[in-house]
Regions:
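Short, well-structured N-terminal submotif of metal-dependent ribonuclease cores
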Residues: 1-34, 48-62, 104, 113
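Alpha-helix capping/helix-boundary segments
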Residues: 5, 38-39, 78, 97, ...
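Conserved beta-strand segments of alpha/beta enzyme cores
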Residues: 31, 68-70, 121
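Acidic catalytic patch
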Residues: 60-87
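Acidic, PIN/NYN-like endoribonuclease modules and their adjacent C-terminal/linker elements
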Residues: 66, 96-125
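Donor nucleotide-sugar recognition loop
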Residues: 87-93
Length: 125
């Protein structure tokens, strides 16, 4: 999941019921991967008051306890490879998510149209 998809799904706001149902079904099957980078990005957004999460640790714990998401951690190679991507997208978080999705042969759930320029499968409901 792209970070915004994770935030939207966890808050159940700004997304359709179809989106929520789709992710709930995929999570139950163990098919939803979330990069640990997304938790870092979410914490930064919360700290900067760009999103409202009262307690980031409780938010993360609740998410992990109430879902079957699979956390993936970036490797040193992922980090290096993210710098070698074409410069269509400048956001280092998204570049790393692109590399991780590609490595895991996963579909990246995102509405970020800049990501469409890369060789990674994307999806948005």
């Amino acid at each position: 999941l792209d970070t915004h998809a994770l935030i939207f799904w966890s808050s159940k706001e700004w997304v359709s019921q179809n989106f929520l149902n789709f992710l709930d079904r995929q999570t139950a099957k163990g098919n939803v991967f979330v990069s640990s980078i997304s938790f870092w990005e979410t914490a930064l957004l919360s700290k900067k008051k760009k999103i409202e999460i009262n307690n980031i640790h409780e938010w993360k714990s609740g998410l992990l306890e109430n879902t079957n998401i699979r956390i993936i951690n970036p490797s040193a190679s992922d980090m290096i490879d993210s710098t070698l991507l074409p410069d269509h997208h400048k956001d280092p978080f998204d570049r790393l998510l692109i590399v991780q999705a590609s490595r895991h042969k996963a579909i990246l759930v995102t509405k970020d149209t800049s990501i469409l320029s890369y060789s990674v499968d994307t999806f948005w409901v």
